[in-house]
Swiss-Prot record:
SMART domains: PTB. GO terms for cellular component: apical part of cell; basolateral plasma membrane; clathrin-coated pit; clathrin-coated vesicle; cytoplasm; cytoplasmic vesicle; early endosome; endosome membrane. It is found in: Cell membrane; Endosome membrane. The gene is Numb. The modification Phosphoserine is found at residues 194, 244, 276, 295, 427, 440, 636. Interacts with SIAH1. Interacts with LNX. Interacts with CDH1. Interacts with TFAP2A and TFAP2B. Interacts with RALBP1 in a complex also containing EPN1 and TFAP2A during interphase and mitosis. Interacts with AAK1. May interact with DUOXA1. It comes from Mus musculus (Mouse). This is Protein numb homolog.
């Protein structure tokens, strides 16, 4: 009966251990590499575990999951928790569990996150693995029950997936040439190489370089054995590809680590820094708009500056470039700019300024035997200290050496001395202190007139005196003095000698001097005071034997109140708040301190040198007023409104 009973029972398969079935394992390994290895399983579930590895951890997890399934089955009957029938796919990328009925993806696990896998020793078909959960960072154990196969086969398939993943990773590292050196003491690492995937051509070049390095290393070892050791960089130069130069440092590093893969270096031409746009070289200089902290003006743009430098504007008027100005010349320009001339009617009350004994820019000329106004009005014997005329300081260097103490005073100047000559000689240097300028039309016309005069008149020359450029003693310092005090031809009280400046000599034949354009201007006897250029031409080409009397226009300020600021106690009409009138800096005549007090207290008539006829004082006064009016009508360099003055006549009987 037992035999009959056993004949109806299902016979069990003969158990064959997994070790005796290598042919199945080989098929599993190929299936894992191709991604076609799958096993029908029952997914028991997953539980959290305390450790990342260990067979006993996996066995405990299987027991817990089977116990929970039995508890739910016994409590709820047939509605208990059942194992899910699924298919386990094993590949080198990861483990995937797909529901057999719904084809839903239950588990998707990467191989890199799996830390341990093992079969169960209590259940032959049981299999489990431990992985790291990516979200919660906890250790999770997933358990399966194989339907047809044993747990050992599933575990072997997962092991093959581990091996395939490791081989793939090593192949990537070998291709990209990345090596990492870890420093345990400093918790740092050094990475060498690049993760960029190389092409077949680059791989061939790399193999060629490795072969050359090995040959160089072999030659180096041979030299070391035969003779004294030499530096690794001094070995025979090995040919390398143009895109992959091999420096000596790489060769020396290969000596230490033969398994290291050399890095590919770019050629020197590609390593040179290049700008984005090189149309404007000024962008790379200091004027770059990206290096500024302030707002950029349109004229300061690099592009504008580049256009200006590339296409300079041609100047139609040729100008002679002067020599580079020194610091002293700049200081003198600043001093002359801030020192207000005494002839400016818009300046404030007169005040003591640094003065210099200068003469008018144009020489005093003789008008056909008649002296000009500034010489006719000489009435005082010139035995007192000469007062300095207040004019802007025009020396090139204000700190230059001054004449010695012997020139502090000029005493006993006789009427025949040529004081105007010395001043005329000193004036061109002062005029040319700044720079040379382009000759204007007036200069060219004056040059033509001078040529004609030179052809007709003999040139009178005299030895110039040393000009006085040093201020006088404090007792003789006087403020800017006007030509006349009070009304014309009215006697006034005598003035102290230290206050009233001396007068000029009666007649001074002037010498030739250079004009601003460098042409010499000879002295002539043609009157240039208060006449128009047409009158001067008429005088030049007319008869020279007749004395001419000009009819000047008198300024209202001269006619009505010829009072100018001067600090003296004898003049009742002096007002320190009266603004001084304009005086033409480049005028033909200056009075240099001649006042009416000199006319009253001194000689009424001018001292006339021999050879000249006496001049009527009225004509002299008229010429003086004319010259002063001529000076005032010309525009002042510091006052743009000085040419708006009116001219009137006034005749006193």
């Amino acid at each position: 009966m037992n035999k009959l009973r056993q004949s109806f029972r299902r016979k069990k398969d003969v158990y064959v251990p997994e070790a005796s079935r290598p042919h199945q394992w080989q098929t599993d390994e190929e299936g894992v590499r191709t991604g076609k290895c799958s096993f029908p399983v029952k997914y028991l579930g997953h539980v959290e575990v305390d450790e990342s590895r260990g067979m006993h951890i996996c066995e405990d997890a299987v027991k817990r999951l089977k116990a929970e399934r039995k508890f739910f089955k016994g409590f709820f009957g047939k509605t208990g928790k059942k194992a899910v029938k699924a298919v386990l796919w094993v590949s080198a990328d990861g483990l995937r569990v797909v529901d057999e009925k719904t084809k839903d993806l239950i588990v998707d696990q990467t191989i890199e996150k799996v830390s341990f896998c093992a079969p169960d020793r209590n259940f032959d078909r049981a299999f489990s693995y431990i992985c790291r959960d990516g979200t919660t960072r906890r250790w999770i154990c997933h358990c399966f029950m194989a339907v047809k196969d044993t747990g050992e086969r599933l575990s072997h398939a997962v092991g093959c997936a581990f091996a395939a993943c490791l081989e793939r990773k090593q192949k990537r590292e070998k291709e990209c040439g990345v090596t990492a050196t870890f420093d345990a003491s400093r918790t740092t690492f050094t990475r060498e190489g690049s993760f960029r995937v190389t092409t077949a051509t680059e791989q061939a070049e790399r193999e060629e370089i490795m072969k050359q390095l090995q040959d160089a290393k072999k030659a180096e070892t041979d030299k070391t054995v035969v003779g004294p050791s030499v530096a690794p960089g001094n070995t025979a130069p090995s040919p390398s590809s143009p895109t992959s130069p091999t420096p000596d440092g790489t060769a020396s590093s290969e000596m230490n680590n033969p398994h290291a893969i050399p890095r590919r270096h770019a050629p020197i031409e590609q390593l040179a820094r290049q700008g984005s746009f090189r149309g404007f070289p000024a962008l790379s200089q200091k004027m770059s708009p990206f290096k500024r902290q302030l707002s950029l003006r349109i004229n300061e743009l690099p592009s504008t500056m580049q256009r200006k430098t590339d296409f300079p504007i041609k100047n139609t008027v040729p100008e002679v470039e002067g020599e580079a100005e020194s610091i002293s010349s700049l200081c003198s320009q600043i001093t002359s700019a801030f020192s207000t001339p005494s002839e400016d009617p818009f300046s404030s009350a007169p005040m003591t300024k640094p003065v210099t004994l200068v003469a008018p820019q144009s020489p005093v000329l003789q008008a056909n035997g008649t002296d000009s106004a500034s010489h006719v009005l000489t009435a005082k014997p010139a035995n007192t200290a000469l007062a300095h005329v207040a004019m802007p300081v025009r020396e090139t260097n204000p700190w230059a050496h001054v004449p010695d103490a012997a020139n502090k005073e000029i005493a006993a100047i006789h009427p025949g001395t040529e004081w105007g000559q010395s001043s005329g000689a000193a004036s061109p240097g002062l005029f040319q202190a700044g720079h040379r300028r382009t000759p204007s039309e007036a200069d060219r016309w004056l040059e033509e007139v001078s040529k004609s005069v030179r052809a007709q008149q003999p040139q009178v020359s005299a030895a110039p005196l040393q000009p006085v450029l040093q201020p006088p003693p404090p007792a003789a310092i006087a403020p800017p003095a006007p030509p006349f005090q009070g009304h014309a031809f009215l006697t006034s009280q005598p003035v102290p000698v230290g206050v009233v400046p001396p007068l000029q000599p009666a007649f001074v034949p002037t010498q030739s001097y250079p004009v601003a354009n460098g042409m010499p201007y000879p002295a002539s006897n043609v009157p240039v005071v208060g006449i128009t250029p047409s009158q001067m031409v008429a005088n030049v080409f007319g008869t020279a034997g007749h004395p001419q009397t000009t009819h000047p226009h008198q300024s209202p300020s001269l006619a009505k109140q010829q009072t100018f600021p001067q600090y003296e106690t004898s003049s009742a009409t002096t007002s320190p708040f009266f603004k001084p009138p304009a005086q033409h800096l480049n005028g033909s005549a200056a009075f240099n301190g001649v006042d009416n007090g000199g006319l009253a207290s001194g000689n009424r008539h001018a001292e006339v040198p021999p050879g000249t006829c006496p001049v009527d004082p009225f004509e002299a006064q008229w010429a003086a007023l004319e010259s002063k009016s001529k000076q005032r009508t010309n525009p002042s360099p510091t006052n743009p409104f000085s040419s708006d003055l009116q001219k009137t006549f006034e005749i006193e009987l």
